Amino acid sequence: MQETDLSIIKTFKRLFPIIRNYKWGLIAASVALILNALVDSSLIYLLKPLLDDGFGKADNAFLKQMAILVMLFILLRGVSNYIASYCLSWVSGKVVMTLRRNIFQHLMYMPVSYFDKNPTGRLLSRVTYDTEMVASSSSYVLVTIVREGAYLISLFAVMVYTSWQLSIVLFLLAPIIAFLISIVSKRFRILSRNIQNSMGELTVTTEQMLKGHKVVLSFGGQKVEKARFDRVSNDMRRKGMKIVSADGISDGLVQLIASLALSAVLYVATFPEVMSENLTAGSFTVVFSSMMAMLRPLKSLTSVNSQFQRGMAACQTLFEFLDLKTEKNNGTKQVERAQGCITFDNVIFSYEGKEEQALNQVSFTIPQGKTVALVGRSGSGKSTIASLLTRFYDVNEGQILLDGVNIEEYTLENLREQCSVVSQQVHLFNDTIANNIAYAAKDKYSRAQIIAAAQAAHAMEFIEKLEQGLDTVIGENGASLSGGQRQRLAIARALLRNAPVLVLDEATSALDTESELAIQSALAALQKNKTVLVIAHRLSTIEKADEILVVDQGKIVERGSHEQLLAKGGAYKQLYSMQFSE
């Protein structure tokens, strides 16, 4: 058995337990599908007595009985079809929900480095397109195999029962069709995986345009984005046509073989030995109609392979993602509230896939309740230091201590509970203002505490002007708010959390001077009895810091108070002079 076949079997074995959780829905659907197939084949078999006894003998009473029987069969067919459709939709919906829940949950625990390497659009495609493909393929395959398989078997049984001599021709079909399926299976797997990759690229391209819509408009990039989208879209279309082509060729060959079998039946029927076996008009009609009816299930059972390969390719992608390691979380230490003493001890760090060191032997200590500011040019490593403190990334060498304990010994959840972070890149959720301020902890804080945090961040100034106040839904990422308003909500969120360690990464960069001065006073009150790490571009905001570290090319090149650094006349003095000469 080939390696690809083994991987498909392995993938299906992992998917089966998820489907098995909804076995009663599957059983009900399968029974209904089999019943549906039996009714269809029974309707064909009724042609024999209808032609031989009803019309052949002009028996009106028999014809009336047949009319009632046909009506009952049609009613039974409708009921079974409804049950099968409903149960399969229920199972399919449950499978999609389970897969999406597993993927979404796994995504939330993936390290930040994974998101650095994978575009958001590709991840969205995984949650939406791939999971839907698995569920739809599973439903289609089940319907086809159970209903069409049962229909094919029942039709063959009807044929053998009616005339085994004519039916013997069908035995020639099975090995030929099996051979065709084995040839195209590998091709379908490869093409299906290519389609998935193209769907991911299509989602990425669309997402980039939507997120950067203002940039596109400002720079007149419509033609560039259209060309990019057309290229990706056309690539996906071409790959889709390859699947259609392979599918069509295999279907055509199966139907050609089946047509030859039909011709053979007609030819065999001319032999006296066959005609002498009481082959009536009704019997021949049943056999011929059964063979014609077999074309549909034969075609479906042949094409089910392509759909199965698509589903398994998507499923394989999902399971490969679920097998990726989540954030390293081997620590066991938990504290209710840390004291807040932070030490960086000879920390060396480089981003994955890059040889250049983002931080090189960085060492400093922030005593409990003190404020340390990081300044330097863009890309010098300031934000990297903040990311390492919260373990968004792990150090390559050296260690980071919180209260004398390596931060890797804390559980991730407990470590991050000790830190309130306000970044220059504010993210808000499509929820109320109150829920955004008390994010992930709305039951922990009272309404009064939320209001107090908003007031301290000077956010109530604009919240009170909104019709629904704190209960206003602000849209995706706070689309209805200005940059400064969004930044104030992020500060209010950090104020409410009241963690012993406060990280301010350009926290006031989006505020006007007046608002910044007001919030600086609020932050000054907040910083009492807290350890504060400030990353600042505006040097005027960190003049009162207990210590200022000047970072350049991943190294700390200067350290001291504002006055001490100015007196040195080094890198800090140059930055200060550049800002205040503007």
Swiss-Prot record:
EC assignment: 7.5.2.6
Disulfide linkage: none
Transmembrane segments: 26-46, 68-88, 140-160, 164-184, 252-272
Cellular component per GO, a single term: plasma membrane
Domain ABC transporter: 342-578
Broad EC category: translocase
SMART domains xref list: AAA
Keywords on record: ATP-binding, Cell inner membrane, Cell membrane, Lipid transport, Membrane, Nucleotide-binding, Translocase, Transmembrane, Transmembrane helix, Transport
A Pfam family annotated for this UniProt entry: ABC_membrane
Chain sites annotated for binding ATP: 376-383
InterPro entries according to UniProt: AAA+_ATPase, ABC1_TM_dom, ABC1_TM_sf, ABC_transporter-like_ATP-bd, ABC_transporter-like_CS, ABC_transpr_lipidA, P-loop_NTPase, Type_1_exporter
Domain description: In MsbA the ATP-binding domain (NBD) and the transmembrane domain (TMD) are fused.
PANTHER family, sorted: ATP-BINDING CASSETTE SUB-FAMILY B MEMBER 10, MITOCHONDRIAL (PTHR43394:SF1), ATP-DEPENDENT PERMEASE MDL1, MITOCHONDRIAL (PTHR43394)
Family membership: Belongs to the ABC transporter superfamily. Lipid exporter (TC 3.A.1.106) family.
Quaternary structure (record): Homodimer.
This protein's name: ATP-dependent lipid A-core flippase
Lineage, opening ranks: Bacteria, Pseudomonadati, Pseudomonadota, Gammaproteobacteria, Pasteurellales
